[in-house]
Amino acid sequence: MGEKKPEPLDFVKDFQEYLTQQTHHVNMISGSVSGDKEAEALQGAGTDGDQNGLDHPSVEVSLDENSGMLVDGFERTFDGKLKCRYCNYASKGTARLIEHIRIHTGEKPHRCHLCPFASAYERHLEAHMRSHTGEKPYKCELCSFRCSDRSNLSHHRRRKHKMVPIKGTRSSLSSKKMWGVLQKKTSNLGYSRRALINLSPPSMVVQKPDYLNDFTHEIPNIQTDSYESMAKTTPTGGLPRDPQELMVDNPLNQLSTLAGQLSSLPPENQNPASPDVVPCPDEKPFMIQQPSTQAVVSAVSASIPQSSSPTSPEPRPSHSQRNYSPVAGPSSEPSAHTSTPSIGNSQPSTPAPALPVQDPQLLHHCQHCDMYFFADNILYTIHMGCHGYENPFQCNICGCKCKNKYDFACHFARGQHNQH
């Protein structure tokens, strides 16, 4: 009977040696050096405890309750993580916990052999070595910017591209994909034209243009319910209820719907004697009544005064023209001072009779296509939204680069917008 009492103690000792071997094997794989020393010290302490016969009941309790001291010298929490002895930090791996403890001890074993730099984390040393080698593995997907640290890339996205992380309910469409599509759709909009999407941090707000309020009383039966639904946000700005709704109701789709509604309206005939307006049936919402090459030339020649005809005076800017500049580009001037251009040599200028100030043929002019047939500001804005900002003959819908204004007009007449 006296020989059977030491059996539970021998079982605990054998199990403790087994845990010591397994921990030593894990520390060898992870490259931890301090873990071996602590394991040997704890093994020696466990051997002394076996000789005294005092620590065995506590070991049995720690095995049953999943808490207490392990062979590597760290306390384990109830969820199985290793707890820091200095604070409440807990980690599943020994190597990560040892790196955390170096914050408390101030140890920096990872040193650069080219300069006095030292760090407690190996990944920080790897990022530092890129400053000596010149390696830049992180590249921005929106521009040619490259950097050696991931944090610098995140700072570049926030500062340069106004990209901020979207915090809210998770949806089927990832935030990165949504931002990428929005940046591709709106990156070519000019600064002189009012953008429909405000990409400034901290929120992304889809705004309703102010000029719709000025022109809706002139054009009947215009449905702006889509803009009203997109403009229902807080005064300080807020995110839409669902990113999927933002992708469906993006500004290009809204312009396409608006163009389809405008095409069904009868044309306004403010100046019956002016042959500038070329009626053209369109089958697609985004064709925007693009005329042929001869029609464009005839429209330009009809709007240019002859040598015997007087030139038109400069119109005064209206309320909507002061707040909105329809001519885009770095060399553009305000629309209030935009007069009818002349081709070739200078035409003789003589006093002319006063024309109506609100004549749309004088207020809306595309300098890239040399077209004057825009009846109102809405059609002009839709047309200018089709031009790219950096390259005016690049399609803002599909990114297709055209050679000149005739190729650009034919591209929209065909209506083949294949996303690249």
UniProtKB/Swiss-Prot annotation:
Q: Which residue intervals make up region (Disordered)?
A: 223-247, 262-356
The entry's free-text remark on domains says: The N-terminal zinc fingers are involved in sequence-specific DNA binding and heterotypic associations with other family members.
Name the job this protein performs: Transcriptional repressor that binds the core 5'GNNTGTNG-3' DNA consensus sequence. Involved in megakaryocyte differentiation.
What Gene3D superfamilies does this protein's entry cite? Classic Zinc Finger
Q: Which residue positions does the secretion signal occupy?
A: none
Its BP terms in the Gene Ontology are: regulation of transcription by RNA polymerase II
Q: Per the similarity annotation, which family is this?
A: Belongs to the Ikaros C2H2-type zinc-finger protein family.
State the name under which the record lists this protein.
Zinc finger protein Pegasus
Cross-linked sites for Glycyl lysine isopeptide (Lys-Gly) (interchain with G-Cter in SUMO2): 5, 185
Further notes on this entry? Answer: 'Pegasus' was the winged horse in Greek mythology.
- ZnF region ranges: C2H2-type: 82-104, 110-132, 138-161, 364-387, 393-417
Quote the subunit structure annotation.
Self-associates. Interacts with other family members; IKZF1, IKZF2, IKZF3 and IKZF4.
Where do Polar residues bias regions lie? 223-236, 262-273, 332-349
Please provide the record's keywords in A-Z order. Answer: DNA-binding, Isopeptide bond, Metal-binding, Nucleus, Repeat, Repressor, Transcription, Transcription regulation, Ubl conjugation, Zinc, Zinc-finger
Specify residue ranges for compositional bias: Low complexity: 290-311
Q: Which GO terms describe its cellular component?
A: nucleus
Protein localization: Nucleus
Q: Care to name a GO molecular-function term for this sequence?
A: DNA-binding transcription factor activity
